[in-house]
Amino acid sequence: MKGLYFQQSSTDEEITFVFQEKEDLPVTEDNFVKLQVKACALSQINTKLLAEMKMKKDLFPVGREIAGIVLDVGSKVSFFQPDDEVVGILPLDSEDPGLCEVVRVHEHYLVHKPEKVTWTEAAGSIRDGVRAYTALHYLSHLSPGKSVLIMDGASAFGTIAIQLAHHRGAKVISTACSLEDKQCLERFRPPIARVIDVSNGKVHVAESCLEETGGLGVDIVLDAGVRLYSKDDEPAVKLQLLPHKHDIITLLGVGGHWVTTEENLQLDPPDSHCLFLKGATLAFLNDEVWNLSNVQQGKYLCILKDVMEKLSTGVFRPQLDEPIPLYEAKVSMEAVQKNQGRKKQVVQF
């Protein structure tokens, strides 16, 4: 049985993906479930986080968002039985790669998959669903009538976040990084209040948002990375179409919430003072926290269930690429790690 793993060279950040033979799994332990994987979604690997967690291994397993059929359960498993269809996210310290035919996983990382939902949809939207819930429900308390700016709304994550915001009755503004993205966002139903095309670099995001909200500013901003410095000091790659942190602070309304994905965000005293005057809050979106601490395991499982329910009722309509077979996973994973794809890539078994 083959599984996909990655190796990190000691000198630099470069990682290489390798298929490795894996011995057959032993008898299932107490609280563990043995799964036959039907689909596994590909996501970027946060090597920095793994290093900070002091997880030193020669080979790290690849692929964490999985959907599959229960083959066997341990003696203390209470939620599942053989032949159940399940979906979940493997923890960071999982021994088994999701990109493998059979895996072992603790029952507290899984929920039942509704019949209506396909394997690829389940695996392809579980992680983005968790991220959207974390950002909009737990970090910014989304409620009907609020205005939400979702940066890069045509990305796989942006799409789910927009659909969740619309479902909760919020007014959504979004940015598009290309003409294709703009057309995609304009086709959304219910319609997005305003699509800001930032591809030519001439449109000012803050001005557009203030205009749309009658000068009041938006209640919630969900960014997709920000520029920390002026154009001359920022590396060229980083420059591409990202808003400056001052723009985001400017367009935030009184009592607004800024949810950022920029882990190295630095705010100067004048920035902090401006946020203080607005009574605004800043939150960091790290969806791994649910799996790094078991304190809120119940909440986490409720989120997973809710994401599946919204998939089955058509609230979530994920942007998925054509499913690929396992033997193409290595090449696809290299592209995903370089952040080259727009739609979510899913391996189907």
Swiss-Prot record:
InterPro entries: ADH-like_N (IPR013154), CRYZL1 (IPR042633), GroES-like_sf (IPR011032), NAD(P)-bd_dom_sf (IPR036291), PKS_ER (IPR020843)
Complex formation: Homodimer. Component of the FERRY complex composed of five subunits, TBCK, PPP1R21, FERRY3, CRYZL1 and GATD1 with a ratio of 1:2:1:2:4, respectively.
Coiled coil (residue ranges): none
Tissues with expression: Ubiquitous.
Function: Component of the FERRY complex (Five-subunit Endosomal Rab5 and RNA/ribosome intermediary). The FERRY complex directly interacts with mRNAs and RAB5A, and functions as a RAB5A effector involved in the localization and the distribution of specific mRNAs most likely by mediating their endosomal transport. The complex recruits mRNAs and ribosomes to early endosomes through direct mRNA-interaction.
EC numbers for this chain: 1.-.-.-
GO biological process, one term: quinone metabolic process
Family stated for the protein in its record: Belongs to the zinc-containing alcohol dehydrogenase family. Quinone oxidoreductase subfamily.
Keywords noted in UniProt: Endosome, NADP, Oxidoreductase
Keyword Oxidoreductase (UniProt): yes
GO CC annotation: cytosol; early endosome
Cellular localisation: Early endosome
Molecular function per GO: identical protein binding; NADP binding; NADPH:quinone reductase activity
Enzyme kind, highest EC tier: oxidoreductase
Subcellular location, principal: other
Descriptive protein name: Quinone oxidoreductase-like protein 1
Record-linked Pfam families: ADH_N
Name of the gene: CRYZL1
